Amino acid sequence: METPIDAPNKDEHECPRWKKSTVVFVLGGPGSGKGTQCANVVKHFSYTHFSAGDLLRAEIKSGSEFGAMIQSMIAEGRIVPSEITVKLLCKAMEESGNDKFLIDGFPRNEENRNVFENVARIEPAFVLFFDCPEEELERRIMSRNQGREDDNIETIKKRFKVFVESTLPIISYYESKGKLRKINAAKSSEEVFEAVRVLFASET
């Protein structure tokens, strides 16, 4: 069965170049509450939410060759190659029928950003960063018991190390361009969403 990454010809599988699409990247350490807050934004502001992690896990469940490779990488706390993640995101956006997207957990490094911009031809309207201390992130992940293979303390620490080394430079990049919107994610979910709500009401 063909997957989004089987493409022999890049041009045939590029994202549509929507001129009026609004894309918001949502970044934060593992356990920072990105998914919960994205669901709130979807409810109140009519965005379509895509989690890079959820799309990768769906590919794993499909039983494809790439799914097995993704599973191994996630278990080791490594970042999946950009081409795979971007093509999964492009396919999801193309099938959504919407033109307002929250992309959660992406880009995770400079390569992700370059591949997305080159394929999708879209720059984010802004980048939402949920800032939260490592100790709080570990506590949240260990207490949520979602049955995910990547929710054990060693893998959590690996994921946070990857986040610090690879994603914080991306956050600095967007901050230098005036596109970063930082939220204190150590507060309660309700307090965090109030800050998010005010932000989206002013930005969109």
Swiss-Prot record:
Give the co-factor note. Binds 1 Mg(2+) ion per monomer.
Q: Which GO terms describe its cellular component?
A: cytoplasm; nucleus
Q: Where does ATP bind?
A: 31-36, 144, 187
LID: annotated span: 143-151
The alphabetized UniProt keywords are: ATP-binding, Cytoplasm, Kinase, Nucleotide-binding, Nucleus, Pyrimidine biosynthesis, Transferase
Q: What is the disulfide pattern of this chain?
A: none
Going by the record, the broad EC class of this enzyme is transferase
Molecular function GO labels: ATP binding; CMP kinase activity; dCMP kinase activity; UMP kinase activity
What biological processes does GO assign it?
'de novo' pyrimidine nucleobase biosynthetic process; pyrimidine nucleotide biosynthetic process
Q: Which Gene3D superfamilies match?
A: P-loop containing nucleotide triphosphate hydrolases (3.40.50.300)
Q: Which reaction does it catalyse?
A: CMP + ATP = CDP + ADP; dCMP + ATP = dCDP + ADP; UMP + ATP = UDP + ADP
In this chain, a ribonucleoside 5'-phosphate is annotated as bound at: 57, 78-80, 105-108, 148, 159
Q: Which InterPro entries match?
A: Adenylat/UMP-CMP_kin, Adenylat_kinase_CS, P-loop_NTPase, UMP_CMP_kinase
Q: Where in the cell is it found?
A: Cytoplasm; Nucleus
The residues that hold CMP are 112
Write out the ranges of the annotated region (NMP): 51-80
Q: What job does this protein perform?
A: Catalyzes the phosphorylation of pyrimidine nucleoside monophosphates at the expense of ATP. Plays an important role in de novo pyrimidine nucleotide biosynthesis. Has preference for UMP and CMP as phosphate acceptors.
Q: What is known of its domains?
A: Consists of three domains, a large central CORE domain and two small peripheral domains, NMPbind and LID, which undergo movements during catalysis. The LID domain closes over the site of phosphoryl transfer upon ATP binding. Assembling and dissambling the active center during each catalytic cycle provides an effective means to prevent ATP hydrolysis.
**Subunit comment for this entry?**
Monomer.
Q: Spell out the family assignment given in the record's similarity comment.
A: Belongs to the adenylate kinase family. UMP-CMP kinase subfamily.
What's this protein's name? Probable UMP-CMP kinase 1
| Source organism of this protein record | Arabidopsis thaliana (Mouse-ear cress)
Instruction: Write the lineage as a comma-separated list.
Output: Eukaryota, Viridiplantae, Streptophyta, Embryophyta, Tracheophyta
